[in-house]
From Swiss-Prot:
Lineage: Bacteria, Bacillati, Bacillota, Bacilli, Lactobacillales
Example of a GO MF term: ligase activity, forming carbon-nitrogen bonds
Name by which UniProt lists this protein: tRNA(Met) cytidine acetate ligase
Organism: Streptococcus pyogenes serotype M49 (strain NZ131)
Binding site for ATP: 7-20, 96, 152, 175
Matching InterPro entries: Rossmann-like_a/b/a_fold, tRNA(Met)_cyd_acetate_ligase
Main location: cytoplasm
Keywords of the record: ATP-binding, Cytoplasm, Ligase, Nucleotide-binding, RNA-binding, tRNA processing, tRNA-binding
UniProt-listed Enzyme Commission number(s): 6.3.4.-
Family according to the record: Belongs to the TmcAL family.
Originating gene: tmcAL
Amino acid sequence: MTVTGIIAEFNPFHNGHKYLLETAEGLKIIAMSGNFMQRGEPALIDKWIRSEMALKNGADIVVELPFFVSVQSADYFAQGAIDILCQLGIQQLAFGTENVIDYQKLIKVYEKKSEQMTAYLSTLEDTLSYPQKTQKMWEIFAGVKFSGQTPNHILGLSYAKASAGKHIQLCPIKRQGAAYHSKDKNHLLASASAIRQHLNDWDFISHSVPNAGLLINNPHMSWDHYFSFLKYQILNHSDLTSIFQVNDELASRIKKAIKVSQNIDHLVDTVATKRYTKSRVRRILTYILVNAKEPTLPKGIHILGFTSKGQAHLKKLKKSRPLITRIGAETWDEMTQKADSIYQLGHQDIPEQSFGRIPIIIKNERLN
């Protein structure tokens, strides 16, 4: 049986994700962000609910990306996720993209020219953000064209880099329905952005989200729930440069900006520059929120849930892979567990996120 990996946030899970799972082949293993997202935002609903939604709509196994993989720039996010999926025996990686191109060809380009491509990045002016530099690199070395906001396409290029030398097949699937950042409600396949924007429109949500009750009946989290905690951390911290990726310039900008900022958007807008993108600033503010220092990654792989078919695959791996199915007195990943505790502070109805939790088990492969 083909084993397909999918890297996801499911923030939240929606019909477009269901389409991706239905289109992908074989047994599907999801490497999913935990309670904080790649662009530096708290998850709308917690990781256990999102895992359950995925397992009820075509996923066979859901594993958790550690905090220092989840909350990273595209290249590190892709590398960390693919490393985990390869340990779980994937043969191919499926992903949605705005532009279906020959990603396999791009893997070969990077395998042959990675040193030259990396060296080229260092020649570009510092006024460009890293994503802008990366786009120029792919344009020069592989002729890739970019148009508009295509975040999934850019992630696909990061997947190509991370797949070099790993002998896995990349399987791009054309994104259906609304564009990634679209707030348009007039789509059966509405975007996650539109769903987050219209959470109070239950009719829209029920048509856009499979098992919509899981979304509707659980706390909806955003930066608004954590901004006061963040403000305390910034004002009370004696040396922000001890936080991961915070340099002197950013520390100064953040310390000044927090005094006049009433919400996260104002703070991000005030701190961001051409060099420091808004996504990067949001990630750094997330690092400050959870007091993240130098990154370390766990050896174990945390299993959030599985179906009967997924369980059979895990049984084949358990003797040769460090699979974690319950976090007890011995920690899995200290940073992720600390981030979970802070996430839980945002709402009294969020249950324990780490200690004692066991995987979600769906006995029937698919419950639509």
